[in-house]
Amino acid sequence: MFHAASAQKYVDASTLTIIGRTCPMEGHPYYRVDTTRYRFDNATIRHYCGYPAGVAVLFTTDSRRIEARWTTAPRSYGWNMTPVLQRGMDLYVRENGVWTMAGAARPGLQDRHASTIVEHMDGQPKECMLYLPAWSELLTLEIGVDEGASVTPLESPYKHRVIVFGSSVTHGASASRPGMTYPARMSRMTGIEFVNLGYSGNCMLQPEFARLLAETDADAFLFDAFSNPSPKMIRERLDAFVATLVKAHPDKPLIFMQTHWHTAGNLDQEAAKFHRERINTADGMMRRLAKQYDNVYFLDGEWFFGRDAEGTIDCDHGSDLGYDRMISERLPRIRKILRLSLIHISEPTRRTPI
């Protein structure tokens, strides 16, 4: 059921600034990738192109309250993710240069949603960033404000961008809300736009993805590329995948991250055998490729969610705690590589990771 909200004026969010898209699609403002240009045979991948994981709307308003009403394509809720992550949104406001969470847009049980995000503000202009649903196709989005308030596009604060290609870990499972995925958090922490190109369960070093990434302009590329493919797939596809990207981006950092240890393998012997073979296969091949190509880097280490299972929601996908651990372990190493490319990185303040 669609619940009426109390805001007196609504603005079509597609008329505001939209960031986080790899290849925008005409007529579908919230798609991450244009599916008419990149035609994937896999229907799930095509659907995921339309999921706005990591996409955000930027605007400035002096309204005392901010609301939203939006529609999503029909889809069942996943059991290991929050409704807010899947169909909801979260709003950040920039104060004194720091992005601070202001509220969340609560989704309904059906496909039409309306929610008050924040109210009783002081009426002074606020710079806002609204993260969109990570696990649903967003069909329409309107932002509600007071009748006499202004809503204007806000210029992107990011001057550099890094494409992050990966699995469900990159897509966002199972952060508590869209703004808590690790690419979104690292963007706020560094002042660099980490663009989310996560494809849950379907990041398997396919040639189609190599073509998409080869034709995408960015300052650097970060890969969570080993969580989905089998050891056999890695052996068969990795060399060609890397060669395609090196040829297309010979001067851009190509940073590959080791996959995480799946803690189900702590007790499940079959799982342990499979995951250990995959980790060892990726490790051996990436060390060779990092020596072969000057712009290829490998971040080893599979324990970034922690050696316990407390950093996951299901022994596989990260929780907010797990992603906090991951960022603490990975980001200093990523910063070092990006600085070698003379990319300016902001130093985080105490509140930025929130």
Regions found by a protein language model. Name each.
Residues 5-6, 60, 103, 120-203, ...:
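Serine-esterase "nucleophile elbow" of acetyl-processing enzymes
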Residues 249-253:
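A short helix->loop->beta-strand "cap" motif at the edges of active sites that frequently abuts
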Residues 343-354:
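Single conserved hydrophobic/aromatic residue that forms the stacking wall/gate
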Residues 262-299, 325:
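Substrate-gating cap/lid alpha-helix
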Residues 7-50:
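Glycan-recognition and processing domains
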Residues 47-154:
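Extended, charged alpha/beta regions that create polyanion-binding interfaces
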Residues 235, 320-331:
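Short, amphipathic alpha-helical "lid/cap" segments that border enzyme active or binding sites
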Residues 186, 203-248, 259-266:
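Oxyanion-hole/transition-state-stabilizing segment in secreted/luminal serine hydrolases
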